């Protein structure tokens, strides 16, 4: 696949139009708003930036990198191990349900793409209970999207969804949403490079405030976002 075509595929994968339901989750941010921790542009940017740095950079992006390499090698065993590792690291019911639902939705979509066949389809069949990052890595590799580009697109999509959630729930205006993107996006290239270079034993999902926020959101009385 040509580089220009891979870029188009990358944009498709990173698009908010990707029908996996990411827009319906706030990943604990809505509880941060309910608690008063997030209440304006500055606090929203701080919350989102911290989660990107600690959780995305320390856990999701490194796992995504491992899944990408497993697809690249055709290593079904490693792919299943990292998929299970990721699901085990989703340490509250809401986060686990989110990843399973998004993974299920992405898998259904991918099965409609006739160009994805052969060894790729065989590995997909051998991946029961697939998480969203495991499938995202697979489609990135199948579409010949470079590992670094795939990770940056994944992080950008997450950031864009978080900014959108803040705009809806704080609420914030569109200019404020763009300021969040400008203020936080600069971290992405550094975090992606660190994720690729990270040793397996350094990967950690330790982000207790995010975990607590997810647990509290499960029973939040009034909410816009899915639990």
Swiss-Prot record:
It is found in: Cytoplasm. This is Urease accessory protein UreF. Gene3D superfamilies: Urease accessory protein UreF. Its main location: cytoplasm. Keywords: Chaperone, Cytoplasm, Nickel insertion. GO terms for cellular component: cytoplasm. It comes from Methylobacillus flagellatus (strain ATCC 51484 / DSM 6875 / VKM B-1610 / KT). Required for maturation of urease via the functional incorporation of the urease nickel metallocenter. GO terms for molecular function: nickel cation binding. The keyword S-adenosyl-L-methionine does not apply. Signal peptide: none annotated.
């Amino acid at each position: 696949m040509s580089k220009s075509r891979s870029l188009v595929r990358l944009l498709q994968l990173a698009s908010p139009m990707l029908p996996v339901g990411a827009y319906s989750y706030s990943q604990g941010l809505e509880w941060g708003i309910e608690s008063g921790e997030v209440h304006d542009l500055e606090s929203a940017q701080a919350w989102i930036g911290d989660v990107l740095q600690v959780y995305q950079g320390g856990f999701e992006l490194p796992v995504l990198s491992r899944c990408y390499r497993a697809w690249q090698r055709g290593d079904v065993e490693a792919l299943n191990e990292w998929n299970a590792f990721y699901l085990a690291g989703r340490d509250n019911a809401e986060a686990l349900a989110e990843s399973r639902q998004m993974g299920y939705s992405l898998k259904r979509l991918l099965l409609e793409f006739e160009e994805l066949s052969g060894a790729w389809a065989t590995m997909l069949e051998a991946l029961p209970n697939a998480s969203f990052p495991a499938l995202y890595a697979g489609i990135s590799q199948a579409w010949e999207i470079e590992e670094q580009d795939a990770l940056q697109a994944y992080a950008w999509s997450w950031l864009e969804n978080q900014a959108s959630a803040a705009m809806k729930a704080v609420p914030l205006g569109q200019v404020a949403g763009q300021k969040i993107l400008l203020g936080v996006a600069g971290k992405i290239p550094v975090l992606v490079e660190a994720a690729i270079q990270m040793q397996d034993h350094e990967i950690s999902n330790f982000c207790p405030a995010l975990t607590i926020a997810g647990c509290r959101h499960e029973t939040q009385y009034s909410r816009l976002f899915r639990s």
